Amino acid sequence: MVKVMRVFVILLFSNFLITESIETFYKTGELMERYTTKNGVRDGTYQKWYLNGQIGKQSNYKNGVLDGQLIIWYPNGIVKATYPITNGILEGTVKYYDENGNLSWQVYEANRPNLQNKIDLSGWC
């Protein structure tokens, strides 16, 4: 009986979750970002665009925590960087690319940056 009651309570509670799709726009009317929330917390795909309409950033959230591949693009549509993230923690190899799409810098051992590489992180989306 206790097990059945717990399942009922979980099912009842799940009906009260509020999922909302949110879009924000630049003053000029172009789409700036799109994401979903569950009970006010980001959950699902997050996307952000440059003013020119080109995708600038895409990531995934689970219960408000980054989880999955974070991708950042240059305004010309070329991938700028990829970050493998698991439950809010950077895991794996981060890759940075130049404006022509050539791999220019990576994070390797123990997910620590190679400090001999210099990269300009200003102007990221």
Where are these regions (language model features)?
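Positively charged n-region of N-terminal signal peptides that target proteins for export
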Residues: M1-V7
